[in-house]
Amino acid sequence: MKKSPGGNPTMQNRSKFYHRFKLPLSLLALFFLFVTACMKDEVFNDQENALPDQNVVSSDQELSSRSWHSPAMVNAWSQALEDMFTFPTNALSKGQPVTARIFAMYHLAIHDALNCITPKYARYVGVERDKDADPDAAVAQAAYDVIAVVKYPDQSMANMNALLATSLAGIPEGDAKDRGIALGHAVAAAILAQRAVDIPYIQLNYPNVPAEGDEPGEFRYIPPANYGLSGYHLMAPFIIASQDQFRTDPPYAVNSPEYTTDYNEVKTLGRAIGSLRTAEQTEIAVFWAEITNRKWNEIAQQVIASRPPQSMDAWKTARLLALMHAAIADANISSFDSKFYYYFWAPISSIRLGDTDGNDNTVGDPLWTALIPALPIGGYPGVHSEAGAAAGEVLIRFFDKDNYDLDLDCPFLPGVIRHFDTISDAVDEFTISKIYTGHNMRLATDAGEAVGYPLGDYVFENGLQ
């Protein structure tokens, strides 16, 4: 068993760190990971910008009648989605930003299905309530209906089909079950309609690609897509107020000493061939190279399992997972807003053009390639570090606790377990891993993490109350 390197922020240091987003950021940025997003055509009735439903009024008698309900069905369907996006069922071919939307919609459907029966928390969409519906039937059907539409075209529904059959078979026949199934259908349809306006923005080849830069530091096209997901920054957030609410401060100048330091770091540690990475640094790079939502769902499930059983009913569990995945989705949208706004180049461009960047202290390498191929998008800030910090903050705030014994695996590295004493430790290692993959300079990862924490805090304070 390996333990992550020391030097990660404590709770106090974490708080100081994420408030840095209000100050001038000092280092540079770049890239992010893989996507070949060919999205299935989704046809719904557009329902633009409908406000999340906030109706949580219910009688004390109604709440007490279902004061505790097992989270087993919620956890089973959350685990099923995690499995669906686990290598080899999902390798590097599924894009993180698009997948973040899938996880958020799926878990919001589960959350809303429950709260349309007994409204303990605010709902994301407005669906007519049915207090007599079976909760487990509603959860199973809502989750199934969402993933059946938003999954990637090459993903099989065989396991989801089997889980739906098993889930419904375990519920006694009768009116409550029928009502639960009908409610699940209705909630899923409302979620899908609410987010149907996203569809143009999740295409890899969105038509309005910005012009290629020609000055040092400006984004250079990366063939064949040139600039991928160039409309993603226009997608409406799930919880945060606007795409630019957590926009980062500008990156540093290309001719600055900080840029030189970060340039040389990612050039030597992030390259595919001839790297100076240690064996553990390479392990860290590969360990965190999977889909962000899958990894953080694994972490969330370990956190949930560590709680006293009676402290986590279906409603509370569903809310936690919905908030965390909504935070990850919003962090992706927020990061893409900053990427598009600053239009900063990625390491693969900055290093290959290092001899013509106006910095006498950088040496270019026209053959440089990152350890892991990355999506052709702006290099600042780091999207993974922003998403990881947002997810971590939701988990920390939800239980007001950072210290956990986390033992995480990786489908890319069978038999490898990495241990973390705190959620913050996991966030910190996730952040630095993107230097080792060759996706980001340190400023980009630091900037992403710095805004990810307050973004997660905002989601926790304002979402699904």
Features from the language model and the residues they span:
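Sec-dependent N-terminal signal peptides
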Residues: 27-31
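Bacterial signal peptide processing site
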Residues: 39-41
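Acidic/polar surface patches and capping/hinge elements
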Residues: 44-465
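C-terminal motif of bacterial Sec signal peptides marking the signal peptidase cleavage site
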Residues: 35-37
